[in-house]
């Protein structure tokens, strides 16, 4: 069954993670798992060039995200405009945990305003206190109702945060969910049925997780075959089609 991946990285993560993947390795993995195209970002705000190189080396395989750090101020905003307008990037990646800011902090406003002006989505890491909690992401969605926000990991590994991700997405129609790293397969079905059949996306978070692990969560979620196809493919296809130039 063909798939689209809503979240993956290219590059090396050192320290505790100790994982890495090249663009070539990622494409090989995609081919093996029938993943046609991937929403791709680098490892941080200092190596967006890796995403650009992957997009150039493998045309039509990636939607590129600008990994942005709002604490870098105007430098980050200008990089967003440059990569979106001149290098065909399709959105923004934020990680409040990595860069140590709260997900609804005012320092995000210039980045969110850029997303609104450029008509691009924002993908944001969720699930870790105190920076990346679903309630804070919901406040950001409330402040920018005309910017679509994808809550990566939909609360991640904590049951309370997973539940909050679903509750907040039900409250704010511009919040979407991506399920990589989230361990509860039943919550994929719950999101499909209660948040919206088109607002839950399959993702891998490569190289942190192998696609087959994430695939099994969708396959065993209790969804029908048609619904599984939505999560694996149609939902992200429809979502990203809004932003095609």
Give the residues covered by each predicted segment.
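Active-site environment of divalent metal-dependent phosphoester hydrolases
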Residues: 11-14, 45-48, 71-72, 99, ...
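A general structural detector for well-ordered alpha-helical segments in enzyme core domains, enriched
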Residues: 22-29, 50-54, 79-83, 107-111, ...
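Active-site gating/metal-coordination segments in enzymes
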Residues: 36-37, 45-123, 171, 175
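Mid-to-C-terminal alpha-helical segments outside catalytic/metal-binding sites
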Residues: 1-6, 17-37, 197-199, 212-245
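Conserved, mostly hydrophobic/aromatic
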Residues: 7, 30, 51, 83, ...
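Mobile, glycine- and charge-enriched loop segments
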Residues: 1-16, 54-64
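Catalytic pocket-lining loop regions of alpha/beta-barrel enzymes
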Residues: 104-201
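Hydrophobic faces of well-ordered beta-strands that scaffold small-molecule active sites
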Residues: 4-8, 38-40, 63-66, 90-94, ...
């Amino acid at each position: 069954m063909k798939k689209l991946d809503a979240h993956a990285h290219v590059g090396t993560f050192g320290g505790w993670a100790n994982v890495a993947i090249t663009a070539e390795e990622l494409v090989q993995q995609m081919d093996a798992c029938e993943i046609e195209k991937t929403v791709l970002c680098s490892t941080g705000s200092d190596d967006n060039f890796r995403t650009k190189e992957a997009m150039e080396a493998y045309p039509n395989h990636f939607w590129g995200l600008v990994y942005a750090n709002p604490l870098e101020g105007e430098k980050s905003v200008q990089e967003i405009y440059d990569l979106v307008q001149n290098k065909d990037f399709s959105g923004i990646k934020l990680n409040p945990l990595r860069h140590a800011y709260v997900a609804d902090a005012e320092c995000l406003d210039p980045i969110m305003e850029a997303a609104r002006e450029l008509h691009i989505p924002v993908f944001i890491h969720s699930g870790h206190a105190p920076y990346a909690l679903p309630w804070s992401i919901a406040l950001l969605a409330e402040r920018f109702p005309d910017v679509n926000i994808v809550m990566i990991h939909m609360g991640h590994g904590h049951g309370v945060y997973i539940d909050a991700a679903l509750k907040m997405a039900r409250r704010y129609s511009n919040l979407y969910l991506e399920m990589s790293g989230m361990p509860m397969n039943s919550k994929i079905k719950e999101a499909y049925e209660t948040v919206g059949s088109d607002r839950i996306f399959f993702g891998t978070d490569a190289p942190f997780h192998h696609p087959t692990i994430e695939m099994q969560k969708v396959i065993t979620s209790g969804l029908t075959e048609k619904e599984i196809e939505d999560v694996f493919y149609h939902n992200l296809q429809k979502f990203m089609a809004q932003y095609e130039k």
